Amino acid sequence: MNKLRQSFRRKKDVYVPEASRPHQWQTDEEGVRTGKCSFPVKYLGHVEVDESRGMHICEDAVKRLKAERKFFKGFFGKTGKKAVKAVLWVSADGLRVVDEKTKDLIVDQTIEKVSFCAPDRNFDRAFSYICRDGTTRRWICHCFMAVKDTGERLSHAVGCAFAACLERKQKREKECGVTATFDASRTTFTREGSFRVTTATEQAEREEIMKQLQDAKKAETDKTVGPSVAPGNSAPSPSSPTSPTLDPTASLEMNNPHAIPRRHAPIEQLARQGSFRGFPALSQKMSPFKRQLSLRINELPSTMQRKTDFPIKNTVPEVEGEAESISSLCSQITSAFSTPCEDPFSSAPMTKPVTLVAPQSPVLQANGTDSALHVLTAKPASTALAPVAMPVRETNPWAHAPDAANKEIAAIHSGTEWGQSSGAASPGLFQAGHRRTPSEADRWLEEVSKSVRAQQPQASAAPLQPVLQPPPPAAIAPPAPPFQGHAFLTSQPVPVGVVPPLQPAFVSTQSYPVANGMPYPASNVPVVGITPSQMVANVFGTAGHPQATHPHQSPSLAKQQTFPQYETSSATTSPFFKPSAQHLNGSAAFNGVDNSGLVSGNRPAQVPPGTCPVDPFEAQWAALESKPKQRTNPSPTNPFSSDAQKAFEIEL
């Protein structure tokens, strides 16, 4: 019966060892290169392994997969885990496992990721390979059982795939110029180029380009008339009918015969975007990103470009002043640091101050008379710019019963002008009630001023006799303890014009009014021949002598000018004033006080016959010393308000 059964069974082929079948291996090598090599296999599965190479690693993986298959078969009976019947395709690009029935792609393995392949010594038909998983970056071993062939034939076919892949890689390196430089000292290597897998069309294009480059090389070596061979001398391959023809000279400029020129975008796409076209100055030498200095916002090229491209309309015209001498600057510094100011906020309560600023308003007239707020200039000027409006107070806490002296003090004399008003207080101003003792620099400056004054002749001012018209009373600003400014008259009358205020070349001294309306007149003691300590002693010794009356000054004594009294709370005053010229054609009173007590200014100076004209500085100093010493009303909050001081200047 056994023989009868064996007669119906399929007879097995006679076993021929692999070493005696070299003709089959040759066909496998050709099939791998053409991509037509395939083997029917049973895919056992894959497991994770610890190493990337070794036959023992592959054998252990096969044992594990076979043991799992037996375990499931015995536990579940016929429903155990079976090996999948599939077809293994081997090519120079990779290994692909396709299901025999469903034609599904089970495994698609790149040949470059395969690190090791080997047959199994325990199972003749077993074959496995180790690869690196692209997602988990772990070593995975895939195991197969060949159906018709042995594991050695499958391993040989995969080895042929390795060789074909290596040949392609070396060919690409030669074409695209991939170079690897190894540094033994740092145990590193640098690779240049790309190993990207190219398509058949790209490969044909590269072959054509290589032919053109070789032709151009031959033309250079032969030293023909033309520097290069014209493109298109080689017919394009049939597989690439649309292959572009490139100029070989452009490629030879790179000095690399193996380099393949890239396709570049058109010039329109390479142009810069619109956001950068607006600032062409960024590419110049003045770019802030090219210099090592500090970055200033106003000097940025983009800012300067915006200023030039979009000019600001309705700009305010600025008139530059005359150059100042060193002596005038010294006198201004001395005036700013030595002029005391009474504390106006401690003696009387104040209501809310209202500051009116009209920087570009035209000059107004009241009842046909020019405003008393004109700023006089020392040179002819036809353009009339706007004056600076004075701070206005609703109520005057210092307004008492007006008398003749107060009216004369409040009147605007010849040469009245305002300093330039700014949004912040001038740096030369001190806080109200601040006292300052002269320093060594002040004493040195006084000594230098004395020596200069002794050498230079005194400048005389020609008397001006303007006509004063009785103006209507106009309510302007109340008198308050001012920051005293000084002016200096020129020797010729000039028309009344208004220009931005200039700083004087010389600042003379002025009378100093206090809170009760009684001023300290300017000192008139000669300063030649006395020491600075004596000068300080004279000033501080006679500072407490008030003056009951203040006679009107004659135009012949026009060096001494009285300025309008304005608010100290507005913090917009400046102690520096420019030279004044002459009287206004109108006058005004403060707080509605009539100026009927003013004496007409067109009378000449009354000098007794037979006597020389007295210098106004000496006359006022003598008048100051002759008065009895009194104390002003002390402030309840300011302990220094009763000690009034008089600042003086030395005329150069």
Curated annotation (Swiss-Prot):
Transmembrane segments: none
SS bond partners: none
Membrane topology: Peripheral membrane protein
Start and end residues of each stretch annotated as Disordered: 213-256, 418-440, 543-580, 624-652
One term of GO molecular function: cadherin binding
InterPro entries membership: Numb/numb-like, Numb_domain, PH-like_dom_sf, PTB/PI_dom
Keyword Phosphoprotein attached: yes
Biased composition range(s): Low complexity: 227-251
Location of the protein in the cell: Cell membrane; Endosome membrane
Principal localisation: membrane
Modification type Phosphoserine: residues: S194, S243, S275, S294, S426, S439, S635
Pfam families assigned: NumbF, PID
Post-translational modification: Phosphorylated on Ser-275 and Ser-294 by CaMK1. Isoform 1 and isoform 2 are ubiquitinated by LNX leading to their subsequent proteasomal degradation. Ubiquitinated; mediated by SIAH1 and leading to its subsequent proteasomal degradation.
Domain PID per the UniProt entry, residue ranges: 37-173
GO biological process: adherens junction organization; axonogenesis; cell differentiation; forebrain development; lateral ventricle development; negative regulation of protein localization to plasma membrane; nervous system development; neuroblast division in subventricular zone
Complexes and interactors: Interacts with SIAH1. Interacts with LNX. Interacts with CDH1. Interacts with TFAP2A and TFAP2B. Interacts with RALBP1 in a complex also containing EPN1 and TFAP2A during interphase and mitosis. Interacts with AAK1. May interact with DUOXA1.
Function, in words: Regulates clathrin-mediated receptor endocytosis. Plays a role in the process of neurogenesis. Required throughout embryonic neurogenesis to maintain neural progenitor cells, also called radial glial cells (RGCs), by allowing their daughter cells to choose progenitor over neuronal cell fate. Not required for the proliferation of neural progenitor cells before the onset of neurogenesis. Also involved postnatally in the subventricular zone (SVZ) neurogenesis by regulating SVZ neuroblasts survival and ependymal wall integrity. May also mediate local repair of brain ventricular wall damage.
The protein's name in its UniProt record: Protein numb homolog
Gene from which the chain derives: Numb
